[in-house]
Amino acid sequence: MFSGVKKKMSKLLSVNKNKYKEKLIDETILGPDKLNNMDTTIHSRDDNLEQVVEQVVEQVVEQVVEQVKQIEIIKRELEENGYSVISNVYNNEEIEEYMSEFFKWYKNTENVEELHTIIHGNGIFKYFEIGHQRFAWLARTNSKIVNIFKQLWNTDELVTSFDGCCYYAPEFKGTHNYWTHTDQSSRKKGVHCYQSFLSLTNNRERTFIVYKGSHLLHEHYFTTLNIDEPYDWSILDENYISNLENKKIYVNVKAGDLVIWDSRTFHQNTCGNSNCNEERLVQYLCYLPKNDIKNNKRQQQLRRECVEERYTTSHWPYPLAIVPAQPRYNYYNPHNKIIIDYNTLPCPILHDLKEEIDKLL
């Protein structure tokens, strides 16, 4: 506990470091940007070193108190509503970097833009090694996002899945279709997973639909309809869902927001009506505790294979479900099967992220 800041402070204090020990805050809460700010503050002052450190520690404590409060709010919203929206997790610079990397890949990788709406239902990328592109890993290894999940699961070590993203271009024209679903098997009771997306765009209409509090109806749904669903994904009976209109929320998200939800929660996305011209880009992210019996040696080995072979998966970090390499559907011409030539795809540049990637495997 408190290892990151302790190391930094111990270099600055040759005496009395135990005086500040109980106040020092783990960098897993603050993130490296806050620690860098602390360094700048300390080295830019000519005051007595001990006084400077005391002031910095007090500022850190205040920041951490606020972050602890925020985590408690997130936990309460997940418990009561089944979802939570955390504002401004990504800053403008991070949004711009993700967008730049995404569109560089989207526009310049052969067949990606041309085939996207033909083979990807509901705007969701599954193919083209989407789960291992640089923009995906930039978000997936972001310390602020990882730290939120560490706090949710009360652990210092997480593992990740290799999910894709969702993109609707502004000019996309489509009609809203029903595909409300749950991402948790009927055989799993209670909380098993929190999943999320990072929004890179502002969306009110072409957005995420969630049924508030529906995670508490998960078991009721399967019991009432006498359904045994072994898989962690199933579209829900439309008649049942029609009775939940008072719980239906079109989530208003801003660029930089992180939306987290309980995998039991009933949800879907929507492209909006035929007049909607919102652009929508979100990156799906999910993490579970590394130290769990379900994260066995086979899962650990498979996770590394997924990275080496650049396999995309569902949102569950375990058990991993690998997405088939070739499209199952052609949404415009079912009789014309499309084959992706993976030999032509460029290799993503990830060497500078390797250390952070390894921590999540």
Model-assigned labels for residue ranges:
Residues 2-80, 350-361:
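Fe(II)/2-oxoglutarate
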Residues 99-103, 212, 275:
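Short Gly/aromatic-enriched secondary-structure transition segments
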Residues 112, 259-260, 264-361:
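Non-heme Fe(II)/2-oxoglutarate
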Residues 203-268:
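Double-stranded beta-helix
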Residues 42, 48, 66-81, 87-187:
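Non-heme Fe(II)-dependent double-stranded beta-helix
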